[in-house]
Each structure stands twice: as structure tokens, then as C-alpha cells.
From Swiss-Prot:
Name of protein: Tryptophan synthase alpha chain
Keywords: Amino-acid biosynthesis, Aromatic amino acid biosynthesis, Lyase, Tryptophan biosynthesis
Keyword Thylakoid: no
Catalytic activity: (1S,2R)-1-C-(indol-3-yl)glycerol 3-phosphate + L-serine = D-glyceraldehyde 3-phosphate + L-tryptophan + H2O
Domain of life the protein comes from: Bacteria
Pfam families reported for this sequence: Trp_syntA (PF00290)
Family: Belongs to the TrpA family.
GO cellular component: cytosol
Keyword Magnesium in annotation: no
Enzyme class: lyase
InterPro entries: Aldolase_TIM (IPR013785), RibuloseP-bd_barrel (IPR011060), Trp_synthase_alpha_AS (IPR018204), Trp_synthase_suA (IPR002028)
Amino acid sequence: MERYENLFAQLNDRREGAFVPFVTLGDPGIEQSLKIIDTLIDAGANALELGVPFSDPLADGPTIQNANLRAFAAGVTPAQCFEMLALIREKHPTIPIGLLMYANLVFNNGIDAFYARCEQVGVDSVLVADVPVEESAPFRQAALRHNIAPIFICPPNADDDLLRQVASYGRGYTYLLSRSGVTGAENRGALPLHHLIEKLKEYHAAPALQGFGISSPEQVSAAVRAGAAGAISGSAIVKIIEKNLASPEQMLAELRSFVSAMKAASRA
């Protein structure tokens, strides 16, 4: 959790936002996936949001569903994902690493064992996409026992009650949805959410990162101008992977230039 606090303090001092890319671990295979993650960090990513392949990712649109399928096709298992996470942490000791999960994967070997394993490999946060705040007690309690930040989603139509719960239970950062629906660059993020960001700050929530439909530098700078601590982009990045499956070096070059441009926009 401290890695998030340190990151946001440093960015605050520099008056810039965070740019956080999302990819699925093991897409399109373990070796290339590790190269992709190194490239994202080298190009300026401030933190990572990583998915563990899951057969029924409800919150995700077709782009990220396909990433899951490619990782499955490569034979990637949750155990291998944890091995990858340990390697990433060893190589990049200070970057915050977040997991985006579904409850079934957390339940598999028991909730406590899951968070213990996260702590062991150096994960900083876990967002369980299909567990609403009001059902989150066993997850967030296990997370905090193991020094893992529980992350909560703040939808654009959140009422005051939900905002207070998200602020009270969340740690690390708050995942602020640009809009409802599923992930996807083809569904561009709506207008910046000034009012929600102000409310979250008023309730002392963890810093808000805006996600869903973030696919251009303009959207990153708009999120930061609206008061968000930064932006998360997933589908736009995964599309670059999908488009370049036959040319791994071209894939890395395009990822590098996309992330550099998105990061530059966070300084606007």
C-alpha cells in the first residue's frame, strides 16, 4: 500500500497525474507478456493494473475477453501468474502493482490464502470486479491483514451513501468509472467527473484514477484537469497487442510510443 502513497506524493510534488496501463498477465504468452510489462514501465507507466486470465470476465468488453482467451490458449494458469508477479516485483521494486480479479479466482484456494500469496509476491492492491462494496467485508478484511489495498469502483451514478462507503473502505486508489457498461476503447469515456472527484476528496477517499474508455492523451489530461490523480487505460493497450501478434518487436515499439504519449499528457 505504501507504494501508492509514495507514488501519489511524488506525482503531487511534480504536479502531474499517474498513467496506469492495464494488461492481462500471460497475453499472448508468458515470455512476451513479461517483455510487454517491462516496455510499459520503461515508457513511463507509473503503476500497473494486471488481470489474471478468467473464463468469464463480466466487466470486460471483447478486447479484454480476447486477451483472456489468448492467455488461456498459451496455457497460462493462476500459479504461473503469481510466478510472473514475483519476477516483475524483483525487477521493479518500487512500482505499485494492482490486480484486477474476479471473485471465483480469489475463492479458489481460500480468500486468506489468496491475499497471503499476493503479499508474498509483492502485489500492492486487488480490485475484485464482481464484488460490490456492501459484500466486500471478507475480501477487504483479508486484504488488510496482508497489507494489500482493497480497491473499489466508484460508478458515475454513485449516490452519497456509496461514495462514503468507497471512501471508508478503499485504500491505495479509487477506481473512478468514466461511464457504466463494460471496458473498451470503442466506448469512449464520458466527460470528466468533477463533482464525484470533489465528493471523494471531501470524504478523504484514496486518490481517484479514472478508467473505462481512456484511449487518447486528451482524455488523460482531461481527467487530471478534472482533479483525478491520473488515468487507467486497458483496452487501447490490449488492442495494440492484438494487432501485432505476428510481429512482437513492432508490438513493443507501438506500446512504447502509446504509453509515452499517454504519460506525457498526465503532465499537462
